[in-house]
Amino acid sequence: MACLAPIVALAAPQRANIESVESLVIESTNEFRASHNLSRLTRNPQLDLAARNFAAHLATGAAFSHESGGTTPEIRVFRAGYQACVVAENLERQYSSAGFATHELARTLVQAWKDSPGHRKNMLEPDALETGIAVVHRAHDGIEDFYAVQLLARKESQTVYFMIRNGSELAATYRVNGKQFTLNPNYGRKHGRCSTPDLLFEGRARGRFEPKNDECFIVEKDGSVTRREPGGCG
């Protein structure tokens, strides 16, 4: 008489909703940035495209690195139509035979980046204004495999330009993001910064400012500094 073994039903692996995972990653990243008094990131479709193309490449089993396939984050966002002056990229891979619930996968990805000093620094990049995210799923050998690419960037067109004019009779000394400059009397100089500008006047003219685009700073005859609204230099 044949002996029949009991049939054990194997639970199907959980399947995370990819679109929801991506949205949750952005939401969690913005909450993390807000807790450090940093601006929220706006999702950009070109950055999404660059992230998705690279995540799909990694999911083929290619080398898991930022230069996989002989490209760099800067090259990839450029090919997607994004002219960047700041680019940071985070990669992560999570896999399990049991799969992941939607919130679980999003939470796991974000926590992995927070726990890594380099990735954490990227998440808190102060000069980034936009983001792209892609999570690509690959099922193989009984494994639910997820590849995530996060991009944080700032467009070249978002560069801040500002002018400094020296209307005094003495040379004016100042620093822009730590770099020192000297401006002779009756001269002007235009600066452009992709990163958030930090303007520090030293010597007779003193004051610290965070210039906005197209603002003008004038060193007056008495050494004081006048800040003028965009277009204020004429």
Language model features by range: what are they?
Residues 178-196:
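Intrinsically disordered, low-complexity Pro/Gly/Ser/Thr-rich segments with frequent PxxP/GP/PP motifs
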Residues 1-7:
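Bacterial N-terminal signal peptides
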Residues 206-234:
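Extracellular beta-sheet/turn segments enriched in Thr/Pro/Gly and aliphatic residues
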Residues 160-171:
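Asparagine-centered strand-capping/turn motif at beta-strand->loop junctions
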Residues 194-206:
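A short, solvent-exposed beta-strand micro-motif common in secreted/extracellular proteins
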Residues 73-153:
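A well-ordered secondary-structure block
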Residues 151-161:
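Short domain-boundary/entry signatures in modular proteins, especially
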